[in-house]
């Protein structure tokens, strides 16, 4: 975790009295911290997803899987709803309490959130082949890197686009809830296609917004917490874009 202490000199958030060079160095350290935390979250998610998949399934040959007792508990029992919904409660709590919690509490909450997402996303390993998951991941990573770079470097304000994309997220949620009852393949395809576009736009907007959050004269501790919150936003953009790409392009295992 020592990698995240590179804010120490110069300290970002020390106010506007610093030179332009110090501001640039502090901003760079702040953004590196954001991406480091995001990478940590993705690593935790991947490890937990793989561990849950390994413990929850057994290979019975010809690419077919059978569920273990643990697999039945997390994939085919009411417990799965707790696994799906608990990250939502945690992310709301983290966002609401960010200003008052300590850096260590914020960090631990983010790691716990990433672990819960990994447990939930392990179901994707049951449904889709490893090769198609890998392709979707690298496609999402390439798109994310390009869009985040654009959001960081562009001089154009993306706030209007961001507001529009947030309305799109609400639409995706409503459509997703509706499709839980309709089970429409066509509607699911449309939802996934729109999700790629929406979270691509949010990646650029969130990056610009996170960059702008830096210039606030905040304390050293608050800048650390802002970097964790920024990492959470970009983490969610990436995870949602990855899942949408996987649903569009993924190859399912033999049933």
What are these regions (language model features)?
Residues 1-255:
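A hydrophobic alpha-helical transmembrane-helix feature that marks the membrane cores
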């Amino acid at each position: 975790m020592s990698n995240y202490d590179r804010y120490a000199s110069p300290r970002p958030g020390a106010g506007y009295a610093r030179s332009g060079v110090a501001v640039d160095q502090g901003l760079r350290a702040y953004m590196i911290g954001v991406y480091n935390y995001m990478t940590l979250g993705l690593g935790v998610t991947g490890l937990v997803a793989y561990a849950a998949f390994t413990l929850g399934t057994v290979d019975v040959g010809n690419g077919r899987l059978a569920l273990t007792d643990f697999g039945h508990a997390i994939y085919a029992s009411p417990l799965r709803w707790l696994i799906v919904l608990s990250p939502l409660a945690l992310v709301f709590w983290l966002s609401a309490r960010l200003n008052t919690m300590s850096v260590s509490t914020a960090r631990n909450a983010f790691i716990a959130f990433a672990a819960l997402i990994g447990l939930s996303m392990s179901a994707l390993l049951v449904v889709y082949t490893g090769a198609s998951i890998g392709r979707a991941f690298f496609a999402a990573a390439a798109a994310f890197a390009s869009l985040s770079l654009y959001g960081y470097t562009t001089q154009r304000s993306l706030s209007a686009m961001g507001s529009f994309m947030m309305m799109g997220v609400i639409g995706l949620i409503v459509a997703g809830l509706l499709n839980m009852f309709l089970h429409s393949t066509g509607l699911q395809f449309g939802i996934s296609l729109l999700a790629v576009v929406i979270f691509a736009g949010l990646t650029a907007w969130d990056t610009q917004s996170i960059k702008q959050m830096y210039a606030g004269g905040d304390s050293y501790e608050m800048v650390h917490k802002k970097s964790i919150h920024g990492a959470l936003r970009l983490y969610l953009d990436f995870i949602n874009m990855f899942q949408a790409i996987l649903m569009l392009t993924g190859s399912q295992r033999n049933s």
